[in-house]
A protein has these predicted regions:
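Noncatalytic scaffold domains of N-terminal-nucleophile
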Residues: 21-51, 63-64, 68-208
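Surface-exposed charged/polar residues within alpha-helices that form helix-capping/stabilizing sites
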Residues: 54-55
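Bacterial Sec-dependent N-terminal signal peptides
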Residues: 1-22
Length: 208
């Protein structure tokens, strides 16, 4: 009888696993319930950035005000995938005019970084690391373009949460710590970046 009991236990475990994943669907990947809000919501990859966006909305800021505040925080809290020195793309729906707006704030190549330069240096493809793959930052200019058209609160107030976290610190999440540590061998090749993103060449300690 023992093999039968064991088989039943396996069936129960599999059933429990399947049921725990479902959210009124038959899809095993649907593991989160829907979120419902009456006045607005924000979604980012970091809980603190999300809370900052919600706080901006509560203060009477627009969705763009909240998005800029959250984006500024992400540039600080997730340096492995976000930053003020990068690009910005936005799609904005204006409920008043019933119009859809798009913004391409991607950075251009530096003026003197021409095709002839690469040919003269014998560079056949843009390297993944170093100064050559870096474009002129478009993110901050994109913030002000969006704010000029859809913003309401002063930019100083919008950026203040990110400034406060930069001065006072913030908890480092496990996922960001993982990718941050993976990149240390690469950024250690550049002294100025090492000084900015490490503590004596090492990852900041995780504190929980």
């Amino acid at each position: 009888m023992k093999p039968i009991y064991f088989f039943i236990i396996l069936l129960l475990l599999q059933f429990t696993k399947t049921m725990s994943q479902n959210r009124l669907t038959s899809n095993p990947f649907a593991t989160r319930s829907e979120v419902i809000a009456q006045n607005g919501m924000a979604a980012t990859s970091h809980p603190l950035a999300t809370q900052v966006a919600i706080d901006i909305l509560k203060k009477g800021g627009t969705a763009i005000d909240a998005a800029i505040a959250a984006n500024a925080c992400l540039g600080l809290m997730e340096p492995t995938g976000c930053g003020m020195g990068g690009d910005l793309f936005a799609i904005v729906w204006d409920a008043k005019t019933q119009k859809l707006h798009g913004l391409n704030a991607s950075g251009r190549s530096p003026k003197s970084l021409t095709l002839d330069y690469f040919k003269e240096k014998g560079i056949e493809k843009i390297p993944a690391l170093g100064p050559l793959p870096v474009s002129v930052p478009g993110c901050v200019d994109g913030w002000f373009e969006l704010h000029g058209k859809f913003g309401k609160m002063p930019m100083k107030e919008i950026l203040q949460p990110a400034i406060d976290y930069a001065r006072n610190g913030f908890p480092l999440t496990e996922l960001i710590a993982y990718y941050w540590e993976r990149n240390i061998p690469y950024i250690s090749q550049y002294p100025n970046i090492t000084e900015t993103f490490t503590i004596e060449g090492k990852l900041p300690n995780l504190i929980f």
